[in-house]
């Protein structure tokens, strides 16, 4: 395709002549200007006025309308490029959101599967101890685990800490005290002694977590630390484990006697 144009550029009273063409190869092969037998051949002249405006005079089989077509074609390309970028950005945004959702879901999943003590007690990966804020335990006298009569049956959810402790004390507590976080108050209302002093055979109770946790005190060591056995603490429902709790931490729990 040969497209050669002669341009007259008038600026500040100076006129120059130049060949305007679409590719160097065509310019080298054709220096004859407009060829009426070539449907793609054309020539034009233009001047630039004092304000920098272009004024064209066209000759040949090509018209300025093709400039608009080319412009629209470029716009179409730009639109496609913009659309592609937007699509890429959208993908990036979607991927970012998916990644965030994945992180969020992953975090929630980890929280769901994180070891818990009974029905929702707090679990510490550093010491495997329940950590609670020290609170004054409600207290009441009149009934104790040693002289209480056994309840008719274990009504707590099988596999949970409450179920295990009920059986561990021989059923000598209420069978309708609810979740572990309610046991201290329920025990006090029922006449049991509740305080912050651990003792062998007592029930350790904490309200930490969504449902709290209870454990059975197997013994108190000479240094004040305590040994407890419990169910569903860090190893899933129905699993009984034991651990030692330091004296400082042991003093922060409630104990039902």
Curated annotation (Swiss-Prot):
Organism: Staphylococcus epidermidis (strain ATCC 35984 / DSM 28319 / BCRC 17069 / CCUG 31568 / BM 3577 / RP62A)
Residue ranges of the region described as Disordered: 101-144
Any Pfam family: CHAP
Segments forming domain Peptidase C51: 136-257
Record's compositionally biased regions (Low complexity): 122-136
Subcellular location(s) per record: Secreted
One cellular component (GO) term of this entry: extracellular region
UniProt keyword terms in alphabetical order: Repeat, Secreted, Signal, Virulence
Sequence repeat extents: 73-75, 76-78, 84-86, 87-89, 90-92, 93-95, 96-98, 99-101
Protein's UniProt keywords contain Repeat: yes
Record's signal peptide: 1-26
Coiled-coil ranges from the UniProt annotation: none
Polar residues bias spans: 107-116
Protein purpose: Not known; immunogenic protein.
UniProt cross-references to InterPro entries, sorted A to Z: CHAP_dom, Papain-like_cys_pep_sf
Name of the protein described by the UniProt record: Staphylococcal secretory antigen SsaA
8 X 3 AA tandem repeats of Y-[NS]-N as annotated region, ranges: 73-101
